[in-house]
Amino acid sequence: RDFRLLLDSLSSATAHPDTARRLILFFATACLVTGDRTVSAVLRLLSLIEPLNPSTYHRLFSHRRWCANRFAKLIANFVIDRFSSSDDIRMVGDETVDGHRGKKVYAKARHRDAVRSSHSHTVYRYGHKWVVLAVLVELPGVGRPLALPLLVALYRDQQTNLAEGRRHKTQAQLMCGLLARLMRWFPERKFVFAADNAYGTHQMCRFAKRHQRQLVLVSKFIADANLYKRPPRRKPGTNGRPRVKGEALLKPCEVVERRRRGKGLNVRWYGGGWRNVEVFTATGHWFKSGKGLVEVRWVMVRDRDGTHRDEYLFSTHISMSPTEIIEMYGGRWNIETTFQELREHL
């Protein structure tokens, strides 16, 4: 019944009732198709339901007028209203590469294939890179959170953007745009967003701080990050330019080396299991020349079993506990599972 309500609401995103009806039929039939998920495969099954002209459906995505942004907003409202009852909505983000080797494929480029690459060997793949923003939801009978994609953006390389006169945007900048759109749709909700080091940039930290009423960023940190205290208050009558940073603090790796022993915790880890870890944590203002300071809480995680590498994480909300930061970052593996399941499904 809820799925029918969603399909009916999608009709408001089209310019003509017939377009809405065909889209609803197409999407509903696509859920039932087995084998290749192509337009032709959907139409073969749909032809058993009602007589149709195949060219009419092929033109749905190229000639008919419908708003993808409106579709995304309707789906986001449907998912968040039903599955995210808590005050803080957990979001995860990542990118995935969809292979397309054709000569006339728009925005095709060579991208690193995260699935087949390792730390010592890089595999490249030609196709599209999609930046994906997903929400984590808990469903009855499922042993882990599900990452449901809400918004996607196509990453275009510098050559494509230059040819089209478009300003080049990095993956992090595209993700900032997706998060900004989501915050406009839900001005009264707060989002906790976790992603890997591609999105743990100083720029994204500043973005999260500007929207700190609605957004918290959790990501990987730099072991030798430059941390400082807040600059002292300027005394009246002082000459010269105001200070932009205070006294230098120890780098995270230096703090770990000096303390030697951290606090023991049992936390939820990748894959939904539990793991005994040793953590070190502190706060400081992350500095980048010309960009200013951003206050963060960093956490160093050391696996006591010795099976995982040491990880440095951070949060733009300094009141978050080390356990919350670790478990929030560990939840991002669910979007990788979503990518894997989508590839198998398609």
Question: What is the predicted function of each stretch?
Answer:
Residues 32, 47, 65, 86, ...:
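Short gly/ser-rich anion-binding loops that grip negatively charged ligand groups
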Residues 33, 97-99, 196-201:
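Gly/Ser/Thr-rich loops at beta-strand to alpha-helix junctions
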Residues 1-62, 66:
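Gly/serine-rich nucleotide phosphate-binding loop at the start of the catalytic core
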Residues 22, 34-38, 52-56, 66, ...:
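Generic alpha-helix structural propensity
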Residues 29-40, 74, 129-139, 254-257, ...:
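Short N-terminal helix-initiation segments at or just after the protein's N-terminus
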Residues 1-13, 25-26, 46, 87, ...:
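Single, function-defining residue in the core of a domain
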Residues 62-156, 283:
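Active-site-proximal, Lys/Arg-enriched surface segment
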